C-alpha cells in the first residue's frame, strides 16, 4: 500500500483524469483501495477503462494474472473491444495494456509475454481503427506493429532491461516514461527520461 500511496501523492494534480491498468507486480484489491475514487468494482475484478478524446476511443485492458509474471487477454475482453468499437463513432482507437501483444525477439521476455495475443491480433486485422497500442512490462523502449496498430512500449521508471536478450540483463539507463498526444489527425509520442539513473545495476 505504501508504494501506491506514494504514487497517488505524486499524481495528485492529475487525479481527475488518471486512468490505470494493472501490471504483473500489482495487486488489484490494494490498487482499488488506494485509488478508490478512480477505480470502480470490487476485490479482484478486472481494472479497465473506457473514454473518448479528440476523436479517439481509449480503452484500458487488464492483462494481469494473479501470481504470474506473464499476462493474458481473454476472448471475452476482445469481444468487449469489438462491441465498444461498434458503438463508438470515434475515428481511431488506442489500447493501453501492461503486456505487449507482440513478440519482442527476446527469448526470456517473450516467454513471459501475453497469452491470447492472437485473438487481439485478429481483431486488429479486422478493425483498422485500432491504430495505437501502448504497453509496459519490458522495461525498455520498443517499436512494433500489430496489423495497422503501432505497438509502443515504455522504459521502466526503475531499472532498464536489455532488448533482444536471451536472458535477463540489466543495462545502464535513466528511468523514463512515455508522453502521448492524441489529436483528431493522429498522434505524436516521445520518451522523457530523468537526468540521472536512480538505481545502481548489477548483473
Model-derived features: positions:
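Core catalytic region of metal-dependent phosphoesterases/phosphodiesterases
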Residues: 1-39, 122, 126
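Active-site-proximal beta-strand elements of phosphoester/diester hydrolases
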Residues: 55-65, 94-96, 149-155, 190-192
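Binuclear metal-dependent phosphoesterase catalytic core
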Residues: 123-125, 142-203
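A short acidic, helix-capping loop that chelates divalent metal ions and anchors anionic groups
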Residues: 29, 67-70, 103-107, 162
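His/acidic metal-ligating clusters that form di-metal
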Residues: 71-150, 187
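Divalent metal-coordination and catalytic microenvironments
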Residues: 7, 23, 61, 81, ...
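Catalytic metal-binding/acid-base residues of hydrolase active sites
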Residues: 25-27, 64, 100, 137-139, ...
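Alpha-helical scaffolding within the catalytic cores
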Residues: 35-49, 138
Amino acid at each position: 500500500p505504501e508504494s501506491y500511496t506514494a504514487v497517488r501523492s505524486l499524481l495528485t494534480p492529475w487525479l481527475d483524469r488518471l486512468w490505470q491498468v494493472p501490471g504483473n507486480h500489482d495487486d488489484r484489491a490494494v490498487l482499488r483501495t488506494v485509488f478508490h475514487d478512480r477505480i470502480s468494482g470490487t476485490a479482484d475484478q478486472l481494472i479497465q477503462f473506457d473514454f473518448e478524446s479528440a476523436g479517439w476511443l481509449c480503452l484500458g485492458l487488464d492483462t494481469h494474472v494473479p501470481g504470474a509474471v506473464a499476462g493474458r487477454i481473454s476472448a471475452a475482453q476482445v469481444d468487449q473491444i469489438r462491441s465498444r468499437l461498434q458503438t463508438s463513432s470515434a475515428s481511431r482507437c488506442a489500447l493501453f495494456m501492461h503486456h505487449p501483444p507482440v513478440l519482442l525477439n527476446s527469448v526470456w521476455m517473450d516467454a513471459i509475454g501475453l497469452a491470447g495475443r492472437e485473438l487481439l491480433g485478429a481483431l486488429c486485422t479486422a478493425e483498422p481503427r485500432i491504430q495505437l497500442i501502448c504497453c509496459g512490462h519490458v522495461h525498455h523502449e520498443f517499436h512494433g506493429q500489430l496489423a495497422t496498430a503501432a505497438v509502443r512500449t515504455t522504459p521502466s521508471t526503475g531499472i532498464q532491461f536489455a532488448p533482444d536478450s536471451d536472458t535477463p540483463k540489466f543495462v545502464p539507463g535513466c528511468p523514463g516514461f512515455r508522453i502521448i498526444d492524441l489529436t483528431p489527425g493522429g498522434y505524436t509520442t516521445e520518451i522523457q527520461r530523468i537526468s540521472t539513473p536512480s538505481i545502481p545495476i548489477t548483473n
